[in-house]
Amino acid sequence: MNSGINPKEKDYELARENTVAMNCHFLVCGIISIAYFVEFLKGDGTLLYVLATIILAMGPVVGEIICYKKQHDTKMIKHFVGIGYAILYTFVMFTTNNHFTFVYVIPMLIAITVYNDFKYSLPIEVGVVIVNVIQLALFFKRGIYTKADMASVEIQFFVIVLICGIQLYVSIVAEKLNQKKLAELKAEHEKTEELLT
């Protein structure tokens, strides 16, 4: 990804945020794609499953790149990142037998903090918790987890709830701090205007 952002774009800040989110999304999805391809080479997954995973991982990234080439400060990139990764994460969570797959969401939860947008983060965080609860129920139903695994279940649940809760808290605080800074800048600008007139 390049960061050839024009400072004269309508929303320079969104363009910068998009660059960071895209780079993180590309990195995470690239690593997941490679990991699943290696699993296929080892004989641990079917070609169809691996191809589906790679398409779900890299498809939104391609969409982001296309949007970015047209306009760096488009809100579409933000939605490709959030919705695209949510679809991949849900697919992987519901089709795996691996106890640790839930951690795939952590890097992207960190990445979306760049937007400092509570309204954007809230449905993502709630979705992550719901997907994890459903996956835990599926693991019990399939016999992957039993009562003997309750410590692992509790760890997964509480880690996800804590990360999502903290991410939402950080989004709220960062958004308020940004609004305060903007209000202070506006007040200073108005004072300067008064002095000049």
Q: Which role fits each region the language model picked out?
A:
Residues 149-161, 165-197:
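HAMP domain helices
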Residues 94-99, 116-119:
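Transmembrane helix interruption/hinge and helix-loop junction motifs
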Residues 18, 22-25, 50, 155-162, ...:
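Alpha-helical transmembrane segments of integral membrane proteins
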Residues 91-97, 132-157:
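Interfacial aromatic-anchored transmembrane helix boundaries in multi-pass membrane proteins
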Residues 74, 113, 120-125:
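Alpha-helical transmembrane segments and their helix-entry boundary regions
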Residues 20-97, 104-110, 128-130:
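Hydrophobic transmembrane alpha-helices and their membrane-interface boundaries in multi-pass
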Residues 1-15:
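Short, Lys/Arg-rich, polar N-terminal cytosolic tail immediately upstream
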Residues 123-135:
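Juxtamembrane non-transmembrane "cap" segments at the membrane-aqueous interface
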